[in-house]
């Protein structure tokens, strides 16, 4: 009886937390659209968005320029930040379970390095219209290389995945730096630097379709996999004892994370540390059960990127910084904290 009561209480707390996070996310969307180099009245933002979504609201004295800024420039940008943040957080949650390592995120497999190499080649060759395609192909190539190297000894393990990801990451970054050193001019270098630090600038409504579809499908699938994730977190031997075909799920999850990350990176460049930070924050709120952790981490990731993008737009007047700077400023100390905590656990 007591266990049933405590279980129902945890479920109630979980539902309440989801409601709070959704409400905060909804409010954040309106606030984020209102903030920028040109400040927009929150009431005008509210009227423009809701009226465009079909609600019967009078536009009042909203100017055409305000309408264009809110609906054509900022709202799609904020929505893309939400989608990218949710997607990167999902990837981090899945990777930390798949390799049973709390410091794992999509980039641990060298996916970002592959995307960087593909984008760098596109920029150097003057193919700026296909930078996203180059980044996508580079990310997929890196993932294939990781899976091949990890399976070279016949049996892929979590350790072999991490080690092969480290090797591929170093190799692809070395190739990128070599190409930049021998073939880049000043304009290309600036383009590469800005792209590799991530940006949501210039987002249009047409940019939303592919990442929204991919993130939505991935969320619906991964949300049903919590039993497998929980088993993986207990270790390889425990998962095998429970009848989990680890090799199948490793290939499946790593491939899906690679495709998802490649789509997101191809859309907005490299935004690091999101997949590292938000799953840990979710664990602090709801524990380690992936039935609760996964949706909470997804919402936290969306919030994190939305507000990181706001900072990139407002911290310097009349200028915009890459969003990756702010995620790194938060993520790097967080990474050090996690590593320090793991070392203390080992010593004790």
Regions found by a protein language model. Give the residues of each.
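Alpha-helical transmembrane segments in inner-membrane proteins
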Residues: 1-348
């Amino acid at each position: 009886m007591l266990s049933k009561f405590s279980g129902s209480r945890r479920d109630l707390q979980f539902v309440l937390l989801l409601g709070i996070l959704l409400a905060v996310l909804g409010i954040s969307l309106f606030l984020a659209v209102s903030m920028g180099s040109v400040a927009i009245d929150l009431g005008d933002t509210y009227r423009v968005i809701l009226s465009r979504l079909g609600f019967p609201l009078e536009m009042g004295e909203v100017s055409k320029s305000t309408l264009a800024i809110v609906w054509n420039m900022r709202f799609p940008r904020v929505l893309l930040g939400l989608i990218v943040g949710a997607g990167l957080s999902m990837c981090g949650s899945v990777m930390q379970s798949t390799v049973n390592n709390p410091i794992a995120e999509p980039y641990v497999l060298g996916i970002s390095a592959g995307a960087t190499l593909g984008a760098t080649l596109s920029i150097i060759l003057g193919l700026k219209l296909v930078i996203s395609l180059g980044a996508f192909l580079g990310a997929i190539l890196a993932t294939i290389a990781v899976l091949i190297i990890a399976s070279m000894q016949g049996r892929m393990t979590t350790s072999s995945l991490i080690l092969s990801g480290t090797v591929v990451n170093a190799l692809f970054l070395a190739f990128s730096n070599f190409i930049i050193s021998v073939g880049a001019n000043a304009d290309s270098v600036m383009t590469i630097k800005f792209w590799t630090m991530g940006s949501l600038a210039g987002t249009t409504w047409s940019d939303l379709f592919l990442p929204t579809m991919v993130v939505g499908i991935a969320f619906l699938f991964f949300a049903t996999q919590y039993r497998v994730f929980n088993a993986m977190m207990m270790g390889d031997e425990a998962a095998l004892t429970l009848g989990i075909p680890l090799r199948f799920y490793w290939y499946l999850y790593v491939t899906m994370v690679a495709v998802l990350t490649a789509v997101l990176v191809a859309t907005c460049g490299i935004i690091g540390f999101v997949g590292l930070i938000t799953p840990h924050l979710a664990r602090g709120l709801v524990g380690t059960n992936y039935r609760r952790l996964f949706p909470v981490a997804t919402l936290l990731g969306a919030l994190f990127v939305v507000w990181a993008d706001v900072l990139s737009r407002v911290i310097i007047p009349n200028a915009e910084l890459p969003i990756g700077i702010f995620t790194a400023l938060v993520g790097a100390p967080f990474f050090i904290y996690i590593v320090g905590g793991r070392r203390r656990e080992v010593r004790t």
